[in-house]
């Protein structure tokens, strides 16, 4: 945060994940005051334990920040899964088995004694980047979060795109193969996530190894250590199969990016999540394929970059959503 004093009011952001919970306090300018070490979500123990953990994470973040609970002007929660954002309901979250039809906003609010602003986790991360991250100089952006799946958030003219049914930015489920496509984590086929997520990359590699026994990936797979990171490292070392797999992944993501250029026409497309550790070469590959699939003007004019806030994007964005609700109304966000 530098030498400047934190600027009140303060906001608490909580980022719920399938394995862990991140939480932090930010000031009115989006500067991080404090973030806790992530704590386990403990999904198998059920939603009541999970809700207790969410509340504990939030209170811990405030306590460790040196602030009092009374100093917190708003609380934001970002969550994965299918949801009804306006109703504050988790519907059928794949990564939170057993948390179906959970009124998570109300239940967390009861535990904290304060109202909670609820948002899709990818939307929250995108808003964090728009507010104080890599997108702070634009009015519209799309952010793909590449990890176990592919999350996506859209900010259009400063507003989070939720859609009528809270499915307004499920861009990981763009269809790129109509018939005979790979099965996605959602159970449907042909979705971008089934081809370009970290999980999909590992699956594609495991299948390809059978036809390339001489690849270094075959040995890594035999040791049970095949991962997206290992595939990227093998590509960097010059392994032909790994190079092809990473290049194919870049091409799939370029298709996704071009689709958003033709529908949202944003100023900026960001890629975040664990897979961006692949670095500049991977990003350049995505950029190089975009002109094949996008009209010339958006292909040329739309910036394509890596996200800037790293793992903090989720809770910073969730806190930013709480700030919106505190300052004006959620339908008219600003910086």
Residue ranges and their predicted role:
Residues 125-131, 151-154, 173-174:
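Adenylate-forming
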Residues 168-176:
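Short, intrinsically disordered, charge-biased short linear motifs at domain edges
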Residues 116-120, 154:
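General beta-strand structural signal in soluble alpha/beta enzymes
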Residues 14-19, 145-149, 167:
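A short acidic Gly-Thr/Ser loop motif
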Residues 1-74, 84-89, 106-114, 128-138, ...:
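ATP-binding/phosphotransfer module of carbohydrate and carboxylate kinases, centering on a glycine-rich
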Residues 21-25, 150-155:
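Short beta-strand scaffold segments in enzyme catalytic cores
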Residues 88-98:
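A charged helix-plus-loop insertion that forms the helical arch/lid used to bind
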């Amino acid at each position: 945060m530098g030498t400047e004093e934190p600027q009140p009011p303060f906001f608490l952001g909580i980022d719920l994940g399938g394995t862990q919970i991140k939480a932090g306090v930010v000031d009115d300018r989006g500067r991080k005051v404090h973030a806790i070490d992530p704590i386990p979500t403990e999904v198998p123990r059920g939603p009541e334990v999970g809700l207790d953990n969410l509340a504990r994470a939030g209170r811990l973040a405030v306590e460790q920040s040196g602030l009092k609970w009374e100093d917190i002007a708003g609380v934001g929660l970002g969550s994965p899964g299918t949801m009804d954002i306006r109703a504050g309901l988790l519907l059928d979250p794949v990564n939170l088995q057993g948390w179906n039809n959970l009124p998570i906003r109300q239940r967390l609010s009861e535990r904290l004694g304060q109202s909670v602003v609820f948002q899709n986790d990818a939307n929250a991360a995108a808003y964090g980047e728009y507010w104080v991250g890599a997108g702070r100089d634009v009015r519209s952006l799309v952010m793909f979060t590449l990890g176990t799946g592919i999350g996506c958030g859209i900010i259009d003219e400063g507003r989070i795109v939720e859609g009528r049914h809270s499915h307004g930015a499920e861009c990981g489920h763009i269809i790129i193969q109509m018939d005979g496509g790979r099965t996605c984590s959602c159970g449907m086929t042909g979705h971008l996530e089934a081809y370009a997520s970290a999980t999909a990359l590992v699956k594609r590699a495991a299948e390809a190894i059978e036809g390339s026994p001489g690849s270094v990936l075959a040995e890594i797979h035999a040791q049970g250590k095949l991962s997206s990171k290992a595939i990227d490292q093998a590509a960097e070392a010059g392994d032909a199969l790994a190079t092809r797999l990473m290049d194919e992944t870049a091409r799939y993501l370029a298709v996704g990016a071009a689709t958003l250029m033709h529908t949202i026409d944003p100023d900026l497309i960001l890629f975040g999540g664990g897979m961006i550790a692949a670095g500049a070469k991977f990003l350049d590959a995505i950029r190089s394929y975009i002109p094949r699939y996008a009209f010339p003007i958006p292909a040329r004019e739309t910036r394509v970059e890596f996200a800037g806030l790293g793992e903090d994007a989720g809770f910073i964005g969730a806190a930013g959503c709480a700030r919106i609700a505190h300052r004006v109304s959620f339908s008219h966000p600003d910086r």
